[in-house]
Design a protein with these regions (language model features):
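C-terminal capping/lid segments that line or modulate ligand- or cofactor-binding pockets
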Residues: 19-40, 75-141
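Extended ligand-binding clefts on enzyme/binding-domain cores
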Residues: 1-80
Length: 141
């Protein structure tokens, strides 16, 4: 699709041409290069990431201290989004956030408050903790 003269990957498109600009932390569009769908330098990909991280996107939390992506299910920054960012090369951004957040007493949770970093949903989210550990390891290798 295209918006404001900039092509982007839509989350979904219907037969009438309606589309959604959206991202879901458990299955992020940021992973498209990791699945060899496109290059991380691809203009369409970069436009897409810019759109889902912009202050105009409802779940970006771009102007918050914990500026990661959320979704309607848990409308706060997700730890899975932080892990996604690590795997996509945003290591310093993530390091700064990890130093600020307490999550669920240091255990990964589903989402955190965008200002305080305290757990808002999904306490002791084991699969998220595993994915976060994997992402940290991959990002630091």
């Amino acid at each position: 699709k295209e918006q404001n003269g900039r092509p982007f990957f839509a989350w979904s498109v219907d037969l009438n041409g309606h589309f959604d600009i959206y991202d879901e932390p458990p299955g992020s569009l940021q992973f498209l290069p990791l699945f060899d769908f496109c290059s991380p330098t691809d203009e369409i990909y970069r436009n897409t990431v810019a759109m889902i991280r912009s202050p105009e996107y409802k779940y970006s939390f771009a102007n918050s201290p914990i500026n990661e992506i959320g979704c309607p299910h848990a409308p706060h920054p997700w730890i899975l989004s932080l892990a996604n960012s690590l795997l996509c090369g945003r290591v310093e951004h993530c390091r700064a956030i990890l130093e600020k957040i307490s999550m669920d007493n240091g255990i990964a949770c589903e989402s955190v408050d965008e200002v305080t970093g305290y757990c808002t949903t999904g306490e002791a989210f084991a699969t998220c903790a595993g994915f976060l550990c994997h992402s940290i390891r991959e990002a630091l290798l």
